[in-house]
């Protein structure tokens, strides 16, 4: 709903006024339920000032959404996050405390609470990330300790950050201490399929996808529970919350 959204969408396009461009800046947008309902219904949508919420312009929601999609097709960006959906899907103990996800990183794999929390403290989301190389699936899927080792490595990195964090990043340290968030993703799935001459959109590719991620999810959850038993739970937000 930002008044400058239309120009913002085009900042990476090499055409037009070069002084209004940022070709090397990666950007993203948040799409609300309100906007998507306007797109669905073919309604107009108000663009409002983020400062005082005054209406600065009214646009055709479908035309704006089409422009966004065409810009993604041409430039690969902006990234898109459906922020109302993200907040609906937050863990229940976060929702019960009134925590809110305001935004994410561009790739949108990190969706953690930010801003002022229920204890009156400011948070800056922190999450340690790593990727498993699916191209080498055959080398590690039978090793029962492999994913546990990666999860342990991520938690060690997070603890090292907490121990070393200077006062200037107190909000980030606080957030890391409250949740101890880590993320284990993948890369190389396309290379995995190519090595087996499996079409990307085939039923076989879908079957492998489900098999691989089921394996990773189960092992990662086992490792998380093991780490909790060894090192204790992350800081509990309050007595009503869950581990």
Identify the function of each model-found stretch:
Residues 146, 181-185, 216:
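Short, contiguous, pocket-lining structural segments
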Residues 1-139, 143, 168-174, 220, ...:
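Active-site cavity-forming subdomains of large catalytic enzyme subunits
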Residues 149-173, 177, 196-243:
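Internal maturation/activation junctions in enzymes
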Residues 7, 130-131, 180-195:
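Contiguous, well-ordered alpha-helical segments that form the cores/surfaces of helical PPI scaffolds
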Residues 34, 67, 188-192, 208:
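A general alpha-helix detector
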């Amino acid at each position: 709903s930002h008044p400058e959204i239309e120009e913002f969408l085009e900042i990476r396009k090499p055409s037009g006024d070069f002084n209004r461009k940022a070709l090397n800046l990666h950007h993203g947008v948040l799409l609300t339920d309100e906007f998507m309902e306007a797109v669905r219904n073919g309604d107009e949508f108000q663009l409002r000032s983020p400062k005082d919420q005054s209406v600065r312009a009214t646009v055709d929601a479908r035309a704006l959404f089409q422009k966004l999609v065409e810009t993604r097709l041409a430039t690969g960006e902006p990234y898109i996050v459906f922020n109302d959906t993200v907040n609906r899907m937050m863990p229940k103990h976060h929702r019960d405390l009134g925590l809110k996800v305001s935004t994410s990183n561009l790739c949108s794999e990190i969706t953690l609470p930010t801003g002022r929390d229920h204890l009156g403290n400011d948070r800056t989301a922190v999450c340690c990330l790593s990727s498993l190389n699916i191209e080498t699936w055959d080398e590690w899927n039978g090793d029962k300790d492999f994913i546990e080792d990666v999860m342990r490595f991520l938690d060690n990195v997070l603890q090292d950050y907490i121990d070393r964090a200077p006062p200037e990043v107190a909000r980030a340290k606080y957030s890391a201490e409250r949740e101890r968030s880590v993320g284990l993703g993948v890369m190389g799935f396309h290379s995995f399929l190519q090595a087996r001459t499996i079409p990307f959109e085939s039923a076989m590719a879908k079957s492998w996808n489900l098999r691989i991620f089921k394996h990773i999810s189960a092992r990662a959850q086992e490792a998380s529970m093991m780490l909790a038993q060894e090192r204790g739970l992350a800081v509990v937000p309050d007595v009503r919350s869950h581990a």
